[in-house]
Amino acid sequence: MRPSQRELGTLVFLLIISVCVSMPAFAFENEPDGFRGIKWGTNISELPDMSLSEDYGNSKFYLRKGEKLKIGDADIDRIGYGFYKGLFYSVGIMYNGSLNFKKLKAIFVEQYGQAQQQKQFGEHYSWLGETVKIAVRYNEIAKSGDIWYVFKPLEKEQEKDDEQKAKKGAKDL
């Protein structure tokens, strides 16, 4: 017995709904186009107030001279700006203390909406956008945490480059 068009339509509708429900959200409120006035993809040569902190070849991390080490009334220990092949693609923010974590989490929820909570050691909240992903983490044992912004297009380029390096390296075996 063949299903009717109505039954097929219902089946297709249910399949579409189940796929949509199971897919992670790819947008969040106020997805940032940069951080503290620096747009994603900006060339490091355009930012004279940056000083090199860590050099990993194509990935380099900089500190900004005169950086404001506060977000709202939360105290920040350090903000590092990541560049891949000279282009701005990530921010790493380090902080200490549960009080700062609570303040920062509230600020990020206010700015970006409800987060996805990850089941990991400590607390981990994330926002996954079309072009940016953000993670706020806190380790209760170490009493410290970090926040990461990552510009996904340059992250994908970095992953492809790393994959090519691994393939080349595998030939040495």
Regions found by a protein language model. Name each.
Residues 2-12:
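Bacterial N-terminal signal peptides that target proteins for export
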Residues 3-5, 27-65, 92-173:
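Non-cytosolic coordination micro-motifs
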Residues 11-22:
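Bacterial N-terminal signal peptides
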Residues 35, 74-78, 86-88, 122:
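Extracytoplasmic
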Residues 61-80, 92:
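Surface-exposed acidic loop/strand-edge motifs in secreted or periplasmic proteins
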Residues 70, 83, 126-128:
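A general beta-strand register signal
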Residues 77-82, 136-138:
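Hydrophobic/aromatic beta-strand elements that line small-molecule binding cavities or substrate pockets
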Residues 83-85, 113:
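A short, structured loop/turn motif at beta-sheet edges
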